[in-house]
């Protein structure tokens, strides 16, 4: 089951179901078919595990399920952030923006690592842009926030993702069951390493950072389709009327951004 764990005593419910399959019990889905754990292992030529003393507890009394979900979400978030830098750079070209806001000196004056990296990425992407070069001597002093502040917004998300990566890395290499056995001193110590709070806060942070990437992206889309702001044909289509161009695409983006705000509400404060 995807639900049933509050994380305060490890992921007992989902991990129990996963672990049952590992020993040939329970149920699993293979190639779209639901079957017994024993048949699922046989279908993949895997022998059931024979657990030794203490291994059953280690399998279920930890944060492995949260780690797995966090890893998948972080992987997608990092990929999303790379594409966000590319999309912002393309928007800068389309809206006849300037690269001056990405000058390294600006970002060294406020040296957040993510901000510096985002600005560097956007400079690199646009360095040979003939479109931007064609109007570099125009009278415009500065661009709209959605373009000019892209490194600051994207960079904050980059830094958030780096923090989440560190938390997940520590958790992946940690021992989270209880009780812990220390052979060198021949001691059994009870503790609370199974508690999921470090991961919960990190994953909430991850969700907020992703939502912010979407917010500024949607605002750039709105600027692109709005002729009063972009100087381009309305909804990026020459002949309006029957053809509404990218109007609905912007509507969809706005709807997704609103949905993200609810999804990004911190779950850790209500658990």
Predicted segments, located by residue:
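A short glycine/serine-rich beta->alpha loop
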Residues: 1-6, 48, 188-197, 236-243
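Mobile "lid/hinge" segments at catalytic clefts and subdomain interfaces of large enzymes
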Residues: 14-123, 127, 263-271
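Long, acidic, intrinsically disordered low-complexity segments
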Residues: 8-23, 142-166, 241-254
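Conserved phosphate/anionic-ligand binding catalytic regions in large, soluble enzymes, centered on
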Residues: 2-22, 58-67, 72, 76-89, ...
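C-terminal catalytic subdomain
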Residues: 197-271
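Glycine/charged-rich beta-loop-alpha catalytic/anionic-binding loops adjacent to active sites
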Residues: 42-51, 183-190, 230-238
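Accessory "access/gating" subregions that flank catalytic or transport cores
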Residues: 92-215, 231
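Active-site-adjacent bridging/hinge elements
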Residues: 56-62, 177-185, 224-228
């Amino acid at each position: 089951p995807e639900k049933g764990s509050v994380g305060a005593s490890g992921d007992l419910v989902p991990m129990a179901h996963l672990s049952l399959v590992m020993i040939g019990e329970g149920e699993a889905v293979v190639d779209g078919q639901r079957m017994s754990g024993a048949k699922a292992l046989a279908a993949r030529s895997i022998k059931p595990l024979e657990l030794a003393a203490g291994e059953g507890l280690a399998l279920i009394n930890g944060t492995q399920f949260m780690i797995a979900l966090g890893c998948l979400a972080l992987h997608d978030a990092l990929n999303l952030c790379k594409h966000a830098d590319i999309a912002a750079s393309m928007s800068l070209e389309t809206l006849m923006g300037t690269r001056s806001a990405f000058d390294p000196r600006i970002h060294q004056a406020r040296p957040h690592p993510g901000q510096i990296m985002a600005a560097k990425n956007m400079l690199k992407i646009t360095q040979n842009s003939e479109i931007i070069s064609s109007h570099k001597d125009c009278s415009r002093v500065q661009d709209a926030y959605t373009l000019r502040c892209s490194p600051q917004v994207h960079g904050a998300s980059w830094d958030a993702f780096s923090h989440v990566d560190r938390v997940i890395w520590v958790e992946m290499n940690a021992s989270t069951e209880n009780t812990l056995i220390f052979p060198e001193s021949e001691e059994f110590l009870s503790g609370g390493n199974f508690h999921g709070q470090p991961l919960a806060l990190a994953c909430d942070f991850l969700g907020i950072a992703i939502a912010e990437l979407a917010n500024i992206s949607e605002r750039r889309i709105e600027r692109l389709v709005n002729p009063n702001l972009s100087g381009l044909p309305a909804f990026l289509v020459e002949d309006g009327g029957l053809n509404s161009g990218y109007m609905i695409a912007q509507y969809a983006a706005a709807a997704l951004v609103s949905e993200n705000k609810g999804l990004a509400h911190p779950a850790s404060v209500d658990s």
